[in-house]
Amino acid sequence: MKKKALLSFFIIMGFFISACSHQEDMQNDYMFKEYNKGDKIILNSVNGGSKTLIRTDKGFVIEGEENKVLMIDFFGTFCSPCKEEALELSKLWKNNSKKFTIIGLTHFEDVSDETVKKFADDYGAYYFLSNDLQNDRIIAQILKDINYQSMEQLPFKVVMKNGIYQKLSNYWDNNTSTNFYLGKIPTDYIQNDLDKIYKEK
């Protein structure tokens, strides 16, 4: 019994170490103008280039890359787990680039593009990073789409295929599935989920 209690304690502690919460005044993320099907959102990356998100019935796709699995990552330049996983996410993206893409959205902060670019350079985040004013609205829409009711923490990721949120393995509870990754998740764990998603029609 003591071993089980001790194990549970370490799992919970590991979770809090692997995620950043934000204690500022948290606005109700459901108080926003929802996107309509077909709405287009142009995002610019601090690493160069732009992508257009298109609203689907239940999610988003990237214009011109509709056939790719899309991961949207909420992150902060202040967030230690976000820094720690950035290079690994870059490798994940490069290793899967024909079938998969990542869009990182800054959240919980108001910083310059230069600050986000420095984060990218310092920690190897070479995938698409948006520091756009529209980020919070996109994030609010995603949280409403998946009916997320808990405190927001970073990093936070969702995965979509054909504009539909995918079921993902729950790193913190192996007996359940979920539709988001919360906290720093090993990329080999994410890769296993991606391999399953690729095979599904």
Region annotations inferred by a language model:
Residues 153-201:
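Thiol-/selenol-based redox modules, centered on thioredoxin-like
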Residues 1-52, 167, 189-201:
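N-terminal targeting signals for export/organelle localization
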Residues 43-70:
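A short beta-strand-turn-helix
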Residues 77-84, 156:
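C-type cytochrome heme c attachment motif
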Residues 72-79, 107:
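Aromatic-flanked redox-active Cys/Sec active sites in thiol-based oxidoreductases
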Residues 83-124, 136-143:
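Structural microenvironment flanking redox-active thiols in thiol-disulfide oxidoreductases
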Residues 71-72, 157:
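Hydrophobic beta-strand anchors of alpha/beta hydrolase catalytic cores
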Residues 120-162:
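Short, internal strand/loop/helix patches
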